[in-house]
């Protein structure tokens, strides 16, 4: 079922898709025009696992108020903390990096879309070139709002993000001494995040072809050559009726990859919320069913068809 706090059109959308909708007991009167199935509190009593998608900071309150007392397995989203007195967990999940660490855990935080995307690119680089990499410098160009957030005004400005959390979040699963430096800005668009990553090597950097080759068979990463802008990808996803226009993956803009002496520059776009949803499915299979990584990935592929999406994207945006 789905927990809903605000009485809006999303309630009927969920019901139409066959979900039971539960609302806070104190707010039930506000939902009198909807066919709700009961209150959230009673639904939690019958739940094995909760995916908490509440605003940042509320997840920790929910953990203390609802989940711990009921001994419910809980997954929290990127707005929460893994350090300090308000930490929801000591594990930030990225299926490519630490899938097995989530098995047996009761409370785990799923990384944000930007953190998930960085991990998906960094892990293959680290696996193939770990001993020769000197440092990673990443500029996050973040979208302002998601596609479905049509009510949110997008201002005519570029917002500067001081001390972004993304770098420390990534270091939580790669190690505190990881030579990763992150800066972030927010731009007025709904059409995906874009990351510009400079990878510095000890000595001469690998060739551009060598870099592209390591991502060729990576799950959830498409290598595209002829994209002019991120909206091209979203429009293609809509044309092919991908659910919610999501590709669920990272798109390396291969025509933008460059090598200069000891440095490789990679540019890739990140499917914002679309990249995190399959990760949540991977995580719940680790926590609830203790599946192997291979088993969880196989089931997730059945749901999201990411291999076929990758094939279609790479074919449409192939090298001219």
Predicted regions mapped to residue ranges:
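N-terminal Rossmann-like NAD(P) cofactor-binding subdomain of oxidoreductases
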Residues: 1-148, 295-299
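NAD(P)-dependent Rossmann-like dehydrogenase/reductase catalytic/cofactor-binding core
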Residues: 245-320
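Buried hydrophobic packing segments
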Residues: 118-125, 170, 280-284
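C-terminal substrate-binding/catalytic lobe of Rossmann-fold NAD(P)-dependent oxidoreductases
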Residues: 1-40, 132-142, 146-270
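A generic structural signal for alpha-helix starts
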Residues: 116, 203-206, 275
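Active-site catalytic microenvironments for nucleophilic, acid-base chemistry
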Residues: 124-128, 200, 286
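Conserved strand-to-helix beginnings and helix N-cap segments that scaffold or border functional pockets
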Residues: 61, 119, 208-209, 277
């Amino acid at each position: 079922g789905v927990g809903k706090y605000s009485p809006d059109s999303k309630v009927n959308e969920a019901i139409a898709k066959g979900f039971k909708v539960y609302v806070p007991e104190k707010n039930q009167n506000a939902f009198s025009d909807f066919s709700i199935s009961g209150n959230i509190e009673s639904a939690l009593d019958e739940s094995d696992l909760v995916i908490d998608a509440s605003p940042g900071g509320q997840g920790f309150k929910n953990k203390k108020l609802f989940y711990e007392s009921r001994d419910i397995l809980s997954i929290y989203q990127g707005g929460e903390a893994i350090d300090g007195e308000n930490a929801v967990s000591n594990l930030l999940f990225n299926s490519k990096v630490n899938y097995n660490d989530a098995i047996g855990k009761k409370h785990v935080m799923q990384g944000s879309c930007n953190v998930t995307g960085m991990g998906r690119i960094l892990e293959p680089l680290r696996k193939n070139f770990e001993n020769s990499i000197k440092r990673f410098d990443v500029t996050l160009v973040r979208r302002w709002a998601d596609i479905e957030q049509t009510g949110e005004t997008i201002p005519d400005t570029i917002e500067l993000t001081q001390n972004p959390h993304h770098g420390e979040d990534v270091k939580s699963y790669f190690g505190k001494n990881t030579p990763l430096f992150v800066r972030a800005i927010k731009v007025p668009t709904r059409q995906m995040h874009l990351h510009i990553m400079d990878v510095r090597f000890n000595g001469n950097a690998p060739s551009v072809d060598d870099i592209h080759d390591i991502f060729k068979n990576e799950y959830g990463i498409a290598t595209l050559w002829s994209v002019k802008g991120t909206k091209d990808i979203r429009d293609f996803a809509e044309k092919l009726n991908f659910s919610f226009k999501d590709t669920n993956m990272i798109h390396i803009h291969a025509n933008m990859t460059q090598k200069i002496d000891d440095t490789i520059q990679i540019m890739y776009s990140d499917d914002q919320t679309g990249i995190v949803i399959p990760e949540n499915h991977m995580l719940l299979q680790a926590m609830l069913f203790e599946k192997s990584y291979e088993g969880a990935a196989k089931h997730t592929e059945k749901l999201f068809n990411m291999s076929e999406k990758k094939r279609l994207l790479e074919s449409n945006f192939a090298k001219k």
